[in-house]
Amino acid sequence: MEIKRFGNIEGKTMMLLHGNLMCWRQYENLIPLLEKKFCVYAVSFDGFDGTGETTYTTAQAQADKLAGYIEKELDGRLDLLYAESLGCGPAIFLKASPNIQIGRMILSGPEYLDFGVLNRLILKVMPQKQYRTAHEKYMPAWALRFMGQIEQGIQTMLRCIPDHISLESVRATWEAGLYLYRTDFLVQPDAKVACWYGEKEGHMKKAIQRLRTAYPSLIVRCFPGFGHGEIINHPALLASELERFLTDGGTERCAEGSGK
């Protein structure tokens, strides 16, 4: 795991967790828009830190490492945690850590990917396909449709794929995603948590229902016209929305019935 610090050490603290196959560089266009006001911590998970010496295992293991870092370096407190896709698993476990205080948390694109009896088949097929994506830097058409993304947006993501990603790490991320919502989440009635997603991405309705069992005051925000992770391709918008959420928590909700 690699954690990079940017910005104003006197500002409020913000931690960014990346999506699958990504690393901290997924936020390289966002960080310059935040670092004048905030102290920004950008994370690369085990298996995605470019060293070839670490392996992603579980979301809980990543959360434990982050908790240790926050406890040591930030006196156990973080003002805002932003997690994209894969990062949502570690974020949920980190929010439940008894030694860590997180003021506000945003889960962006925390899709419900549990397909029941099909999970085992998916684990036999999908990690190999995504492993090829990591090394060939190419996203097939079916993957674009699945994510609700366009080719231009995906090209931006592909440039952020780090070196030395192993098949073992990719498989572990798929297992983490498929089984995340079987976790017995800690109920946190007063937690200031938001779920953000793009209008074009699916698998969100069940995710929102499940997240509300842990965070009854969950704020849901749907971004019109966006696919999975696409908000990161709009760094100015993302920066302004992060600052707004950190300031007032936000009140906007998605339209009734959205979140397929």
Task: Cite the ranges covered by each PLM segment.
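Conserved HGGG/HGGXW glycine-rich cap/lid loop of the alpha/beta-hydrolase fold
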Residues: 4-52
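Active-site loop/oxyanion-hole signature of alpha/beta-hydrolase fold enzymes
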Residues: 41-80, 240
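Gly/Ala-rich beta-loop-alpha elbow adjacent to hydrolase catalytic centers
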Residues: 82-87, 91
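Flexible "cap/lid" loop of the alpha/beta hydrolase fold
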Residues: 96, 100-133
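Conserved alpha/beta-hydrolase catalytic His-Asp/Glu region
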Residues: 117, 133-187
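Short beta-strand/loop motif that positions the catalytic acidic residue
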Residues: 189, 195-197
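Acidic catalytic loop of the alpha/beta-hydrolase fold
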Residues: 199-204, 229
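Catalytic histidine-centered segment of alpha/beta-hydrolase-like enzymes
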Residues: 226-237
